[in-house]
Amino acid sequence: MDVLEMFDVNYESPILESFDSTTQSLNDVHVFMSRIQMSAYDADGEGRIEYRNLKLYEISSGIFISTDRLDTGASGVEDDHEMVDYYSSARLTREFLGESLDSQKSDYFEGIKKVFSFYKNKCNESRYIKEFFEEIQFRNICGFPKQAGTSSTDIFDQFNSVDVLLQDPVTSVWNKKVGSKKANIVIIPPATNLPITEACATAGFQPEGFPKLGSGSFFTVQFDPFFSTRFKAHETDDVALLDPTLTLLHEMTHGLHFQKGIANPVNRSGETPAWATTWGRVTGDNDAFKETPMEELLTFNKHTIDDDIEISDHLKSTYIGFLYNGRNEDDPTESVDGVYQNVSSFLNQYRGFEISSDFQHFIESCYGVKYNQESKKFIVNPRNIKRYVQDGFFIDEAKFARILNIKTRSYYTLMPDNLGVWSYRVDILNRLRETFDEDRGLLSQELDFHTALTPVVSENPALELEVAGMQRMVSLPKIKASYLPSDIKIKNFTGQKISHDTILDTNISGIIISKIKYKSDFVVDESMPRSSLNTTNYNLSPIKGTKFETDIRDKTSVKVTVSEITAPMINHVMKLDNSKVLTERPSLNEDLEETFKNTKDVYIPKTTAMMKLKEGADQTLGAVGFAVWSGQILEDLYNLAQKKEVSIDQIKDDLMSILPFYCAYKNLSAEKYEQAFANATLDAFLIFATDGGGFAGLGITVGAIAINSMYAKAETMEAYDSMFGKYVDQYQNDIKNFTLNAYVQWENNILSRLWNESRLAITGFRNMLKTVKTVMEFDATNQAYSEEDRKIIKAKCEEIFSEFPMLMQTFAKNSMTANLENASKIFNDIVWQKIKEELDQYVIDSKKYFLDSLEEAYNNGSISAESYYKYQTEAREKFVSPREVIDLYIAAHDTVVKRKRYIRRYSRKYDLATDFKGNTVHLNGLGEGTQDIQDLYGNYSVYADKKTVSTQEGHFDQTIKIAKDTNTINKVVLAVSSNNGKEYALNKDEQYTISFWLRMPVPSSSEERRIFSYSAVSGVNKEVEELILQVKNNEFVLATANLLRNSEFVIEPRIALNRWVKITIVNENTRIKVYQNDNLLGLIKDSSRKKPIAQRGTFKFYNYNVDYQLDDISYYNGTISQRDIKYTFKEDHGQFVYDHWGERLQYNKAYYLLSDDNKSAFETVYETKRLKLKSVPGVDIKYLGMNDRVYGYYGGLQFKLVPLDSKNMNNYVRWGDKFTMQSIETTNLSLAIIQDNAYFAPTQLKLISNEGKSEEEIFTFDRNIKLQNAAILVGTGNSKQGPISAYKRGYSGDLWINGARLDGYVTVVNKSNYSNDEIQEKFKWIFVPKDANWVE
């Protein structure tokens, strides 16, 4: 019988009512009644054993479905121990009622069949899933030893079965047994509404608690195909969903473990083994009768999840995160020891027993142990246990569909051949939310979870490399065979077996790889000849469904050529022998070049040839060839980057991907790796530059990166095969052009050999310098290097540079065995000259690149003109050696970073905030005394004395004096003083810039209204207004009014009205520029009459005759370029806070937090652009980030920030709005004020007669009363007036709150006629919009 051969049954299929063994076979019976033994609970929680009849549907051999719900107290899960008769149960998987029960059972049945049909299809596509169900259906190996005291050492190996029952015709009781059927998995509806709660709801781990049907034991899975698990994460996290097919697969894996006796804390004799409690001690779970975390770890691979998401061990095992969490973080040693002890204790149960080869392989795959046939026991290696603790226990994926680990925190998981996990991103979640029942999170029946959702597709990686000293797997997926290292030297491998999932100790091209795990079954092809060094070439090819074992004994080394990986990554195989060698870069034909060129976002390295050394060399097809290859790839990548074909981020990511291999090469710790990987700055550079020889290892990973990138960018596998095939075919054709004679001739050419190996070192040195570029020019942290950092970088570069000649000498000595003197002479006279020529050319190229980069940095405003000319001159004069190249890179990098920080932090010498109500000007951030500030313009002191303000007839001015301290060279002193303060003579070249944010309403008249002016002293005590900004004739006017009255002009385009704009005025001696935001508006020139500031300059902002708003006044002691203006505008604009409608908040203005229903409001005051809102009791104000709207939170609800005087508030009722009272048609009145989650703090309510003659205090409330969740506040009369019932019916008048009359609808209800709930339902809010009409 085939795996998962589906029987023709449906929900309506009739139950077996009669059976004649002479004419019928139970093999043809698939729907029948059986009896189940199960645990149940009394009302007081006492347990007992019950037998219940159950209708079973066999959908495939050994796999049964029941549509009747069994309540077992959730099978040991902590839950309500509620007795439910499964015959009358209306709670199948959801709370269904009455007549819908049968239809819902039918849906459940069809849903289960649909899941298994899905599995059936996957069995045709994947041998992993097929073998899994082969284990489930046909390989029933019970792993429990017999009970203590028995003489037999056999392992139970029997089929589990269920009884087939008929109904007694007299008593109508189903008790007549006619036979048994094999049963391995029985799927039943969940015992509660949630099929997965704090643990797997699958029943089977209590000695007397698992169900039995007939003889043997099977596994019961409680499962609902219409349910997807939802994680209870934080409110800011995504809601991850697991596909039901994965959930069922997970539970069936438990069943497989149960059959094999794996990770079961209770043995067949009912005793709890010591290892179960040992594991509990390690994990903090001492309940041996509960499913242990180790069992969950074995069910699927890593049970990792973020530490801040608290979910059960079960969900951890089905959710795959990006960190490992398989050990005790506080005491890793305890974890290793604990796991070693409990695994050893568990496996000792089988000591001395005869076990089958299948069961042996099962145990070895689960625990990484070996079985000794002579002693009949499992050998546990602590080293393997340590690896399992670090990486999480895993099952052989060929048997149990092991989930692959992922690298990022992106809330999706991968599984072989597309089975099982669909975790949806936010945009998909938003589209699906309408299909979920809000209360129970159930998928609607309309959603077909097999077809409606798109799963994440991933190809199986060809092999995994676990780097020595690392605590994570480094996968190299999707690599073609010809780009894998063709030769793998296997050390210390004598006498071991190669089988699937064999772990080999290897050394590949100078990079220490501690383990290689092949992900496919391979067969050994011994047809390839052996070499003179007793090295056997094995061609490993995956054969689907084929298992093999072969011994490799007494071999000094084994050469493994990977020719095929996994389908469809085959057909491209490159084989080299000693008669064929490639000595230069293969030439690509024009068509192929064009293909690469036109491929969008794909970069293919045009590598130099991989050179093969002479036969028997230690480095086979490895170090030298790959090193040259890697160097060329890096060079190509940078060339492509300069052409904008590859982004700098891509290159940086690729470089960072190499770090794990360098950590392994240098035997660095995992902590060092994590630090370097995270920072990607100085540590990254130091790892790259550790030693010159280290560059030999670049080839493997750089090649893998390039191929991975090409694969990832190819839209289809066919496109990838086509693209790659053309390249490989051309490559192989070029190889065929080389003969053995050509190879020998090349081999004998000492100069060529020396030169090629010298180029290797040159390439490495170039790569080192380019790494310096990457680190310093594209530094993600945007921080300048410290002096110590610069010393380290420079010292390391010089160290490598100084070792360069010695490195060349070493290559020369290693390349020749005779006549070292002659070799040295050849090296010094010929090779070294070529090296210097190469370096000279590189300096020339680098200088050009540096100058081009400098020009670009200056044009985009990253560096100032001073720095640009400085480093341009230095580059032209000093750019003569790589050392000085490095010096300039460091200097330029620091300049760029410092310039940005200067603009951001230091350019604003005065930050003025205004409050026109008090007619004051404040200097923010400056106290008395001197503060030193260093920037690109030199060293300055900023001095602020006591602040002085002068007010003159309705306006004020703030005098800013600029003076030069003649006692200090290159220093300028800025002083704030009164008009009568001391005057200083200034240098003739003094310039200035002033900027401010302005909001001007639409002018209501044509009269002149001055906003801003600047005055200079022309003569003795005579001020001349040199610049005026004013509103005139409904337009903004910029003028030099008194100096040149006829030079007034209208700014075009006009300054925007009724919204915030930034005005920047730049005084450049003979001309004045005015900018709006970052655009030039106007220019005033007067070279003959415009004078520099001679003694004193006065800036004036006017607050009369114009209703404008002013903010963030800034003064600069020099001119600001347009690039700087654009930069500061963008930065300043991002710092301001905006209200709900996008208007910028103003200083010292009152605002309301308005609820989403536009009713409840809290008054607050916005103080500064740093968003300090005045405290309101019970209100939590949150600023969500730059350019975000501001919201307040109260009682879990969100409120919008709304200005008090906003025109948008016209339709809302606020404190101070007017209301009119309606007629009251009842007596015995009480006042009900009902608010939804609002804060209410009136001191009193007053009721005024229509005539306005009396003003009586009716109700008095305590101050700051907090009303939550539609609370009701009932007023009572005071001692003077008495209760409100004293008033006559039909009374109307005005309602006042805090002295403000309310003019709108107010409802006063007779509380005696309504309950509190009715009042809440009927009258949601006492203050309503004026156009509301719901008052009865």
Curated annotation (Swiss-Prot):
The keyword Nuclease does not apply. This is Putative botulinum-like toxin Wo. When overexpressed the N-terminus (residues 1-476) cleaves rat synaptobrevin-2/VAMP2 between '89-Trp-|-Trp-90' in vitro. This releases the cytoplasmic domain of VAMP2 from the synaptic vesicle membrane, which would prevent the assembly of the trans-SNARE complex on the membrane and thus prevent vesicle-target membrane fusion and neurotransmitter release. Belongs to the peptidase M27 family. GO terms for molecular function: metal ion binding; metalloendopeptidase activity. The keyword Ribonucleoprotein does not apply. It comes from Weissella oryzae (strain DSM 25784 / JCM 18191 / LMG 30913 / SG25). GO terms for biological process: proteolysis.
